[in-house]
């Protein structure tokens, strides 16, 4: 059976536990954790969001925050390159990008650390399909729902005799570990928006084991995408890991017979552009929750605008976790 590419959004987690997997809830709970971020940095972040005690609740609020971080990094680099005795920034300003990075990392960590699991009635046909076809899997969310289940099922078992690889090896991330050599035919597991398991160590991106991640893990990283949609491309471009994943997304879509988009809002224009580029020649299957208070015609029009194509099939379900038609031919 030919390969497909399966792209999973946050609707996967929301179908299981909407309270835990709500980004708004995660951002608020980390903000209110007295050990997650200092009061000084909270004040600075609030000022970026408009002042008056404003707190981050949505990705689209993070536009000015990203601009301030970029400015701080630029001024710090000028100071370092010219060996100035006086810094452009205060101590708080110098530490601000790190503090925000740690906050974002802790939000992703909270979403990742979930004690439940996907129902077996959903997982078993999905795992069986991926194992049989070596179809590619790409995730936009930070949780371990699929990643943990795939590891436990033995789908990601090293370079040889494996179903999927993500480029993370013992010494850290290597794009060479994504190359198919020695007649390998594996598929790809692409963390498109990163993972809180990723951290930088002596200039190399590495990945923790699942049991090593906890709410007090200190390291933020540049390998998590949590920002206003207009800045997501630049965050991806600044990370060697994420850039490689997006390059391989194009490769994966190119060799796939079909694209299945599961639990995705349609809000990430950088992803929509990639799907649209392949959607003229590939059939797209969209699986979404039917509780959006819109008619089927409205949703068909919505997706045709997002993917610049009418070559798609739309599944609208009361519970997306009842979907098992991974191998269906349209």
Question: Residue ranges of each PLM-predicted region?
Answer:
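SIR2/sirtuin-family catalytic core signature
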Residues: 1-16, 25, 30, 38-51, ...
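Gly/serine-rich nucleotide phosphate-binding loop at the start of the catalytic core
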Residues: 1-135, 140-148
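A structural signal for short, well-ordered beta-strand segments and their strand-loop junctions
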Residues: 5-9, 136-141, 158-161, 188-193, ...
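A Trp-anchored, charged/polar loop motif used as the substrate-binding/catalytic surface
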Residues: 116-120, 170-177, 239-248
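A short secondary-structure junction signal
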Residues: 148-151, 200-209, 271-273
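A short alpha->loop->secondary-structure connector
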Residues: 153-168, 263
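A recognition module on extended beta-rich or small alphabeta surfaces enriched in W/G with H and D/E
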Residues: 178-210
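Flexible internal linker/loop segments at domain or repeat junctions
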Residues: 203-250
